[in-house]
Amino acid sequence: MEKRLRLAPSPTGLFHIGTARTALFNWLYAQKIGGKFLIRIEDTDFLRSKSEYTKNILQGLKWLGLKWDEEPIKQSDRISIHKSHIKKLLECGAAYRCFTSEDEISELREEQKKKGLPPKHDNRHRSLSKEEIETFISQGRTSVIRFKIDEKIVIKWIDQIRGEIKWQGKDLGGDLVLSRRAKGYEIGDPLYNLAVVVDDNFMNITHVVRGEDHISNTAKQILIYNALNFNLPTFSHTPLILNSEGKKLSKRDCVTSIDEFREMGYLPEALSNYMAFLGWSPKTADREILSLEEISEIFDLSEINKAGAKFSWEKLNWINSQYIKNMESIKLVEIMRTYWDENGWEPPSQEWANKLAILIRDSMTLLKDSIDQSKPFFLIPTIQKEGQDFLENRESKLSLKLILNYLIEKNTIKLNKEKAKEIINEISKKHNIKKGILMKSLRVAFFGSLIGPDLIQSWELFAESKTDRTRIERCL
């Protein structure tokens, strides 16, 4: 039997990291067991669902490298099918019309609140006669369709992450609403729990992997599966992603959408790598930097933690920096060029750009760090106070004069790393000036401060861009 998993996002907002991690776990498990990864867009919330959010979700999945195996389906295209299954439940007596008004429901909840009871429908219209139904309809009352839930029933299933889960029928909030309100004998638009069951069955889904906030929905859906004589999939409920305070990560925590992570300068490979370990503790991994293919080979749902997973910026930043350090210079330059173009910076050659990428990548945490790291190589920086103080030293000024004179006298030399070292050594020995003074003086001239990337490699780049002398001259 073919193994089939799905991601079923609602397009009511930007692609969220919680949904992205659910997608990743589904994709990884599908790869591990040789199954298929499918997409279903749950867009039956017509007021909040937007096509641009659907597009954003699919683009985010592509960016993360999570390819789906079949054309995505939209739940809104299947409303008539959902209604036909509601009709079946009505005909077999598993569901009924409920004419309780919104005001009556509010009154019931208020009474329950006063008594300290949880909100729960009283199923008052479960046994209406045909005459009573016709009376309500003639009065212009609208009805929802409710699914009967036996309060004495115990729903049990084996969760691949949490083991056996039990849920009491009496704790499910009363008979379940399957459809929105409609007039007469019409059936309103289907609601989440009914549509999910019908569509998972239609798609032949064998494994449902989703967040722990769906556990109560699973209990309700199992009852619908059984009433419709559908085969049950295997369920797995992943832990929530928590913020630093141990609360569910939300938009209030600032960055939550995949777009925002991309714009901040995180690589898709790094974000996927981090998300895989967010709630999963593999027993067989001997390192933390792994490709999606490597992760899929060792991924095991049973090793996912039950407790919530705290989001760590520090860990994500470290993983991202490792990916940048190990990235091929040509690929990194391709990415960095987008930032350079935005600032109007043009490297003198591709080779020069490759050398710069190799020089600064070890200092980068985010891709956008390339802006600050690259800037001194395109624009001559202002000399900072500590640099100005250092240049007040007589030996510092002398060092720069001697280096400049050498460059002028040897105008025909092509300066590379070896030649740069030779110049420093020769001047130091000939004029009895410490190498440290010479190099610090150059660093101030090049970067405007006493800190910066490798000086010798930087000098080679400044020489190639023909700005090394200009930078030295401004300090004299």
From Swiss-Prot:
Intervals of motif 'KMSKS' region: 248-252
Primary location recorded for the protein, binned into one broad class: cytoplasm
Keywords: Aminoacyl-tRNA synthetase, ATP-binding, Cytoplasm, Ligase, Nucleotide-binding, Protein biosynthesis
The reaction(s) this protein catalyses: tRNA(Glu) + L-glutamate + ATP = L-glutamyl-tRNA(Glu) + AMP + diphosphate
Entry GO CC: cytosol
Localization (cell): Cytoplasm
Chain location of the short sequence motif 'HIGH' region per the record: 9-19
One Pfam short name: tRNA-synt_1c
PROSITE patterns linked: AA_TRNA_LIGASE_I
Any one Gene Ontology molecular-function term assigned to this protein's record: glutamate-tRNA ligase activity
Bilayer-spanning residue ranges: none
InterPro entries, A to Z: aa-tRNA-synth_I_cd-bd (IPR045462), aa-tRNA-synth_I_codon-bd_sub2 (IPR020751), aa-tRNA-synth_I_CS (IPR001412), aa_tRNA-synth_I_cd-bd_sf (IPR008925), Glu-tRNA-ligase_bac/mito (IPR004527), Glu-tRNA-synth_I_codon-bd_sub1 (IPR020752), Glu/Gln-tRNA-synth (IPR000924), Glu/Gln-tRNA-synth_Ib_cat-dom (IPR020058)
Record: residues binding ATP: 251
EC number: 6.1.1.17
SUPFAM superfamilies: An anticodon-binding domain of class I aminoacyl-tRNA synthetases, Nucleotidylyl transferase
Lineage: superkingdom: Bacteria
Keyword ATP-binding set for record: yes
GO BP term, pick one: glutamyl-tRNA aminoacylation
Subunit comment: Monomer.
Function: Catalyzes the attachment of glutamate to tRNA(Glu) in a two-step reaction: glutamate is first activated by ATP to form Glu-AMP and then transferred to the acceptor end of tRNA(Glu).
Similarity comment: Belongs to the class-I aminoacyl-tRNA synthetase family. Glutamate--tRNA ligase type 1 subfamily.
Protein name, as recorded: Glutamate--tRNA ligase
Organism of derivation: Prochlorococcus marinus (strain AS9601)
